[in-house]
């Protein structure tokens, strides 16, 4: 997909009533398993760890491809639904993008899909999800090295 498709999805989700936003976040979280890394493929970056900000392990997988950056993710069972949903949304929409495009995504953009009452409690989750993906992509070797 693309950065434009991410922004379009964010706008669509933002326009929904609170209950529909929550339902969509749960659906996104449930789809994360389909974005798991394929063990038969090479990954330039395997960033798998449990940070203090997170209840369980988050694994982000990145590789450079002629068509852009390929992304995959897997998380432990204790990871919050919101972290799963945001990770799935970014991996799904940013797969194939350039490192520069991925670096341009802001937590503020993704915050728009989180109901305001939930966002007050979970802003750090949004920041964490965006930063982890950008850090993993940032570990790619520059082209030509």
Task: Describe the residue ranges of each PLM region.
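C-terminal binding/interaction regions
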Residues: 100, 105, 109-145
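Structured beta-strand/loop patches that form or line metal/cofactor-binding pockets in enzymes
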Residues: 40-62
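Alpha-helical support elements that line or immediately flank enzyme active sites
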Residues: 86-100
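Short Cys/His-based metal-binding microdomains
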Residues: 81-85
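Extended low-complexity intrinsically disordered regions
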Residues: 1-48
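Conserved interaction-surface patches within small, structured recognition/assembly domains
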Residues: 63-80, 94-95
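Generic structural signal for hydrophobic core residues of well-folded globular domains
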Residues: 29, 93-94, 133, 137
